Structure formats: structure tokens, C-alpha cells
């Protein structure tokens, strides 16, 4: 109950651009740009306004949280995405390829660099706003997932 709102992977905008250019018979360069809007951040609570049980919920205790009588506690619904959105992410990759034929075989050597500008933006956060009824989580909205760091891949293939 109360779990309406935006789902965790709701990215409103996503753009992907890819291109390559062969500047000679043996050489080509290429690039990829992926731009994504941030996903929603939830603000999950622990309490339950309907009875005294404690569990992961969509309700946050806002008053009388320390009362031993559950019916005296006052809760507010926390819709999915109530914690705002994460920042946009940008990922640019580049590659260079070399082609060579020998006999009846074709060889390709490709060096690709991913996340060329080494963006390290947060892609996931701690969505638990409360650790217990009325107790705020000190790590709420702290990063738990980040963009992959820059890395390179060398590929050699031979077709015969």
C-alpha cells in the first residue's frame, strides 16, 4: 500500500549516438556517446500505520515516533521517487581499428576506450530514509553504485 510513483529505472531521457569513420583502407576511428537522465530516489521508511509491525514500507513516521502505542504515531506516505532524482550521466567511448588482409585471412585489431573522460557519477543510492521508526538513516542518499571507471579493451580477430 502507498507504493505508487516512479519505478527505480525510470529514466525520462536517454540519448545514444554512435559513429565511425574509415579514413583509409586500413584504419577507422569511432565513438559512442550515451547520455541518461537520473533515476528517481526513493525514501523508504520502516513503520506501518495500520498496526504495530515494523518492516520496509512506503511510510515515514513524522510525529510521536517514540510512542509505544502504534496508533499514536503519525505517518506520511512516501511515494516512490519522493527523494528527487540522481544527476544525469554521460559516457563517451572512442575506438580505433586497424584492418589487414594476408592470404585468404582478414585480421582486425581494435583498441576501444570506454568512459574516456572517466565520469564517476552516482548511479544508485541508499533509498532507506529510516533505520527504525523515527530514526533517520545517516547514509540515506549516499552512493552505492557508480559509473564504471575508464577502461580499455584490445581485440584481435582473424577471419579465415
Where does each model-flagged region fall?
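Gram-negative outer-membrane beta-barrel transporters
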Residues: 1-45
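C-terminal beta-signal and adjacent terminal beta-strands/loops
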Residues: 26-73, 85-93, 97-160
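Extracellular loop and loop/strand-boundary signature of outer-membrane beta-barrel proteins
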Residues: 1-6, 15, 79-83, 139-143
